[in-house]
A protein has these predicted regions:
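Non-cysteine beta-strand/loop elements that form the S-adenosyl-L-methionine
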Residues: 49-58, 92-96, 179-187
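Short amphipathic alpha-helices and their capping/turn segments at secondary-structure boundaries
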Residues: 37-47, 76-86, 117, 172-175
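Glycine-rich, proline-tolerant flexible connector loops at the mouths of alpha/beta enzymes
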Residues: 1-20, 54-68, 97-103, 128-138, ...
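Catalytic alpha/beta core domains of metabolic enzymes, predominantly
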Residues: 132-211
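Distinct, well-ordered alpha-helical segments
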Residues: 10-11, 41-47, 103-112, 137-149, ...
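Conserved anion-binding
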Residues: 58-66, 70-132
Length: 211
């Protein structure tokens, strides 16, 4: 994550991690999470061959997480996606709080679809739908994935779940049945957004593979 090291100090050594890994093997993508131009420049200089940006469906959360409105983040994404294309690297985007927000509560399906349509204007390699705080349930996953697939045909969807309420793996199963073919997970279920009160880790890679 190439985010502000003063706000997220545990990510301050992103360049050192990439340096230790060396060049990515053929077919492997080192993805750098960026939120602005500075992060993009750092990620490219460090050797990332794919960048990902987050745009939050909840304006309140976007302001706390990224210091600006959702509209501002969408504008930044469209610009950075163009720069990534010029640099010859892939770009993908995550629609965060797609299943609920700790500050605004429920996020309507219409809002998620609206944000997905707007970020799709840059023709990203992939759009992710993130349950940032682990609030989603399988029926909600089915509805949101189906609606977004209809709204942005031709763009692959990825889903990102947390297991806050022990629904993360059921949500992953629902996403697969709804047509998603890529899921985020982390070893041991580590992770969690520092700006999301009460957030727990991602679904665990080893448990997802077992499922």
């Amino acid at each position: 994550s190439f985010v502000n090291p003063r706000k997220v100090p545990q990510m301050a050594d992103a360049e050192a991690v990439l340096q230790a890994l060396g060049a990515p093997p053929s077919g492997v993508h080192f993805i750098g999470l960026v939120l602005n131009h500075r992060g993009f420049e750092r990620a490219v200089a460090a050797g990332c061959n794919e960048i990902g940006m987050a745009v939050v469906a909840s304006d309140s959360f976007n302001r706390r997480n990224q210091g600006g409105s959702t509209d501002e983040s969408i504008a930044a994404w469209l610009d950075l996606a163009g720069k990534a294309e010029q640099a010859g690297i892939r770009a993908q985007v995550t629609v965060s709080t797609a299943f609920g927000c700790p500050f605004e509560g429920e996020i309507t399906v219409e809002r998620v679809v609206e944000v997905a349509r707007r970020v799709a204007e840059a023709r990203p390699f992939e759009i992710a739908l993130a349950d940032t705080i682990g609030a989603g349930v399988p029926t909600q996953v089915t509805e949101i994935v189906s609606r977004v697939r209809e709204a942005v045909p031709g763009i692959p969807l990825r889903c990102h779940f947390h297991n806050t309420r022990n629904t993360g793996f059921a949500n992953a199963f629902a996403a697969l049945h709804a047509g998603v073919r890529t899921l985020d997970a982390s070893l041991g279920g580590i992770g969690g957004c520092p700006f999301a009160p009460g957030a727990t880790g991602n679904i665990a890679t080893e448990d997802l593979l077992y499922q």
